[in-house]
Amino acid sequence: MQTLHALLRDIPAPDAEAMARAQQHIDGLLKPPGSLGRLETLAVQLAGMPGLNGTPQVGEKAVLVMCADHGVWDEGVAVSPKIVTAIQAANMTRGTTGVCVLAAQAGAKVHVIDVGIDAEPIPGVVNMRVARGCGNIAVGPAMSRLQAEALLLEVSRYTCDLAQRGVTLFGVGELGMANTTPAAAMVSVFTGSDAKEVVGIGANLPPSRIDNKVDVVRRAIAINQPNPRDGIDVLSKVGGFDLVGMTGVMLGAARCGLPVLLDGFLSYSAALAACQIAPAVRPYLIPSHFSAEKGARIALAHLSMEPYLHMAMRLGEGSGAALAMPIVEAACAMFHNMGELAASNIVLPEGNANAT
């Protein structure tokens, strides 16, 4: 049975030769070079992923939604009752939540995964529960390091199993009341930013309660002293089971050489952890949308990412990842279905990259 260390060691590097071939092919399509902008660079990125066999392509699509409750909810950092996590997880099994509707539109399957809901098991939800909610990060660690490592490995294996069954494009999502608080703590730690710069309203927290949320994040970091150079340490001390789960999806997909669409702010925090744990993950991550949450810009700048969509969204659940899946498919369609300049006897002069 593969260990977490072995999984991280075996993440493949992108295929530079395949990327060069893809770029050459794209430059020969019926258009001025570079005129399809980031659609072209996305196709080249996909071509370099070993799990796609040297060409941009999309097979089955899946959005993995990690569901968990958080002990820090007790600090008054969320407006929704904690039970909403379980209620919404059940609604996901019925296909009625935002991510389910958008994923269905994109032709993707939603996998609802319980990694720490504080309720009885829910029919139709995959059970990877570590505990009924994680610890309150304002007074101590979210979980033990062993719990974090075990969950990373379990989710990574689940992701790789889906890849073996034909999934070639993954999206990550989460569900958990109060989870923007640990996400903000993680972003603060990884980027060296003060909590005031990265704490936002989450799921409509009143402005009058923002200062308390900022204070909670600062206390969590001061009490737990997470090491920003150790991604697992940060996850276990100031993260949460859902954030660990999303990180595990990224590690597993990268191990299989396959792309992962990020969602919003919560997924940015998990991406920061994943890239700290295994920098080789970075080429497999695709930013979907620019979250409206306050700390989004800082997190994305640290990741050196520019999302494809600006929709003022902050729902979470994987909704942005699902919404961006057709963009990935469009990059593949461009690559495979456009005609070639040579076949039409068109010779473009050099310097036409900006032509329209």
Curated annotation (Swiss-Prot):
Note: In vitro assays of this enzyme are performed at pH 10 because at physiological pH (7.0) its activity is undetectable; this makes it difficult to assess the role of mutagenesis of potential proton acceptor active site residues (Glu-174 and Glu-317).
Taxonomic classification: Bacteria, Pseudomonadati, Pseudomonadota, Gammaproteobacteria, Enterobacterales
EC class: transferase
Pathway, per record: Nucleoside biosynthesis; alpha-ribazole biosynthesis; alpha-ribazole from 5,6-dimethylbenzimidazole: step 1/2
Residues at which substrate binds: 88
The protein's name in its UniProt record: Nicotinate-nucleotide--dimethylbenzimidazole phosphoribosyltransferase
Reactions catalysed: 5,6-dimethylbenzimidazole + nicotinate beta-D-ribonucleotide = alpha-ribazole 5'-phosphate + nicotinate + H(+)
Top-level lineage group: Bacteria
Record family assignment: Belongs to the CobT family.
GO molecular function list: nicotinate-nucleotide-dimethylbenzimidazole phosphoribosyltransferase activity; nucleotide binding
UniProt keyword annotations, A-Z: Cobalamin biosynthesis, Glycosyltransferase, Nucleotide-binding, Transferase
GO biological process, one term: cobalamin biosynthetic process
Function: Catalyzes the synthesis of alpha-ribazole-5'-phosphate from nicotinate mononucleotide (NAMN) and 5,6-dimethylbenzimidazole (DMB). Able to use a variety of other nucleotide bases as substrate to create alternative lower ligands for cobamide.
